[in-house]
Amino acid sequence: VLSANDKSNVKAAWGKVGNHAPEYGAEALERMFLSFPTTKTYFPHFDLSHGSSQVKAHGKKVADALTKAVGHLDDLPGALSDLSDLHAHKLRVDPVNFKLLSHCLLVTLAAHHPSDFTPAAHASLDKFLANVSTVLTSKYR
């Protein structure tokens, strides 16, 4: 459960991301593909090379979903219900991959905003991404 302080930290951090969200989403995906090559199996139809338009487009989808989640911190299940259905029933993504992408998102945010990536911000963003992952995997059961 996100505390009021966590919610404030997440909103502040995501506010600094601003218009860079799609770029950071794509960068996090690239990090994930390079660091955890098994994740590529979910994207056999993608050009996974650096700067790929397909990775950029999917990065934007990730960023848009996270932006929506930040706007609905008190109702993540409601805000992400359609994505949960998609990932559980159609795409059948292994739940561990959400944790891997979350880690890569944290690394990307820290790389771009080192002075803002305080221990408190890191902890709050980690909790937020864990909650998003939990919601996205909730319909696997």
Swiss-Prot record:
PANTHER family in UniProt: HEMOGLOBIN FAMILY MEMBER, HEMOGLOBIN SUBUNIT ALPHA
Cited CDD domains: Hb-alpha-like
Modification N6-acetyllysine occurs at: K16
One GO molecular-function entry: oxygen carrier activity
Residues that coordinate or bind heme b: H87
Chain segments annotated as coiled-coil in the UniProt record: none
Organism: Hippopotamus amphibius (Hippopotamus)
Residue list for modification Phosphothreonine: T108, T134, T137
A biological-process GO annotation: hydrogen peroxide catabolic process
Tissues showing expression: Red blood cells.
Protein name: Hemoglobin subunit alpha
